[in-house]
């Protein structure tokens, strides 16, 4: 893993105290930084000749509220980016936590990597993470009037409203969810009675 050791040393040298944590697992490095340092770190990751992460491949939101079966005691929302350096042929995962769990806000890195445009919109749509400085932060996958953020752990599985076609009105209508919650108990089939005949 000389390549990872080289990357780790370069990150520690260039970023210094901005490195909140650097985790090596399954042959990959994850860099964790504070929200206040996020934009500056992103620029350094892209522009420093010893790092040169030219491409942001993906960004997703994460809700850690139920992480480790509720044992997680850190901040709730994070943005996780996957970065690629074509120059040095290495990858990095960059994680930043929003400092406020009630209203998660992070700076947008769209002026560093413009490929993040729709990724930040998706994280806003699904998790409610607001990216300050994003030029067009609006929903991208849910409906215009959608209430809430469906990938949050506290969002109900059945949702709040359902959409259906009403043949009388000849249009799509929204109405409160009519699904009744039920408990599903698995049916146990004993081996001796499998298939309906006794063996």
UniProtKB/Swiss-Prot annotation:
What is the protein's known function? NDH-1 shuttles electrons from NADH, via FMN and iron-sulfur (Fe-S) centers, to quinones in the respiratory chain. The immediate electron acceptor for the enzyme in this species is believed to be ubiquinone. Couples the redox reaction to proton translocation (for every two electrons transferred, four hydrogen ions are translocated across the cytoplasmic membrane), and thus conserves the redox energy in a proton gradient.
Q: What is its main location?
A: membrane
EC number from the UniProt entry? 7.1.1.-
GO molecular function annotations of the record = NADH dehydrogenase (ubiquinone) activity; NADH:ubiquinone reductase (non-electrogenic) activity; quinone binding
Q: What class of enzyme is it?
A: translocase
Lineage from the top down?
A: Bacteria, Pseudomonadati, Pseudomonadota, Betaproteobacteria, Burkholderiales
A single GO CC term, please? plasma membrane
- Which Gene3D superfamilies does the record associate with it? NADH:ubiquinone oxidoreductase, 30kDa subunit
Keywords, comma-separated and alphabetical: Cell inner membrane, Cell membrane, Membrane, NAD, Quinone, Translocase, Transport, Ubiquinone
Which reaction is this enzyme known to catalyze?
a quinone + NADH + 5 H(+)(in) = a quinol + NAD(+) + 4 H(+)(out)
Bilayer topology term = Peripheral membrane protein
Q: How does it assemble?
A: NDH-1 is composed of 14 different subunits. Subunits NuoB, C, D, E, F, and G constitute the peripheral sector of the complex.
What top-level branch of life does the organism fall under? Bacteria
InterPro entries given for it?
Answer: NADH_DH_suC, NADH_quin_OxRdtase_su_C/D-like, NADH_UbQ_OxRdtase_30kDa_su, NADH_UbQ_OxRdtase_CS
Pfam families, A to Z: Complex1_30kDa
Sequence similarity: Belongs to the complex I 30 kDa subunit family.
* UniProt-annotated location(s): Cell inner membrane
User: What is this protein identified as?
Assistant: NADH-quinone oxidoreductase subunit C
């Amino acid at each position: 893993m000389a390549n990872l050791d080289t990357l780790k040393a370069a990150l520690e040298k260039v970023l210094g105290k901005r490195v909140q944590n650097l985790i090596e697992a399954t042959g990959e490095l994850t860099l964790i930084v504070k929200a206040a340092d996020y934009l500056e770190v992103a620029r350094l990751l892209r522009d420093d000749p010893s790092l040169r992460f030219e491409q942001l491949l993906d960004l997703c939101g994460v809700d850690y509220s139920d992480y480790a079966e509720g044992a997680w005691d850190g901040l709730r929302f994070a943005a996780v980016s996957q970065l690629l350096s074509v120059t040095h042929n290495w990858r990095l995962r960059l994680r930043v936590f929003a400092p406020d769990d009630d209203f998660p806000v992070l700076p947008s890195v769209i002026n560093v990597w413009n490929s993040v445009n729709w990724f930040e919109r998706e994280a806003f749509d699904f998790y409610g993470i607001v990216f300050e400085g994003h030029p067009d932060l609006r929903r991208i996958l849910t409906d215009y009037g959608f209430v809430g953020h469906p990938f949050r752990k506290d969002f109900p599985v059945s949702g709040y409203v359902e959409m259906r076609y009403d043949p009388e009105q000849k249009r799509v209508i929204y109405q409160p969810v009519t699904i009744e919650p039920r408990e599903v108990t698995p049916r146990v089939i004993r081996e001796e009675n499998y298939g309906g005949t006794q063996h």
